Amino acid sequence: MILINDKNCSDLKIVFSELPSIPKPVRNVEEKFVSGRDGSLIIDRGTYQNIPIMLIGHAGCKRTELIDYFGTTGELKFETSPDRFWKYRVTAIDVKEVLDDGVLLAFSINMSLGPHKYLVSGKSKIIGSSTLSLKNDYNANAYPFLKIKGTGTIGIIKNGIQILSIKDITDYVDIDCEADVIHRNNVNYDNKAIGDTFYLDANKTTELKFTGNVSEVILIPNWREI
């Protein structure tokens, strides 16, 4: 069985013909052949392609309930791996009524999964103030979300190097490293920032230091792996 946004498919009496296995994502590697040179030139961009899958089955619910259950984007989790999930986007959905009353449906859903498996534990909050030591035990860089409470100008130092400074903070500021956005109450703070958002390096410990008038830092690491 699967869970969509932590809701079990059995709640809607969904039965799958067969659950797909999720392959490893394809790495974006380009091979170029150069005249007068043996072999080829390999350009590895260090990124991965999304993973297409199809879910086929039957459901004992209404059509609108089935469509609302999967939505357009969300989190997909398998009961066999409850500690991990994929972020997905629905690319196509086909639903047919098997019975005239519309309470037995046949469906096929095409999804595009992001290349990374996310750790459920990566949603847990890590709380500190002036320093944080974060060990990434996984094979992919993690892009955290931070809420920094404080006032004035606040700086972030990663492994001894200042990477970001934000001014004119009142009460708090949010930093979404995955979306590369700095904001407070949906007001963009990019014009008040110097530097870049950051990631937590794969298979390493990242030391963060926060300078300025900081009272508390709340960080969600978003651990993930390939």
Model-derived features with residue positions:
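Oligomerization/assembly interface segments of phage tail-like spikes and tubes
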Residues: 31-61, 103-116, 206
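Mixed-charge, glycine-accented linear interaction segment located at domain edges/termini
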Residues: 2-7, 112-114, 199
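Short polybasic amphipathic segments
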Residues: 1-7, 74-76, 154-156, 180-184
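Solvent-exposed loop and beta-edge segments used for protein-protein assembly and interaction
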Residues: 47-49, 70, 101-105, 138-140, ...
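Solvent-exposed edge beta-strands and adjacent loop segments
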Residues: 1-50, 83-97
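Intrinsically disordered, low-complexity segments enriched in serine, threonine, and glycine
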Residues: 119-226
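Short, acidic/charged, Gly/Pro-enriched secondary-structure junctions
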Residues: 56-94
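Short, charged interaction patches at domain edges and termini
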Residues: 93-126
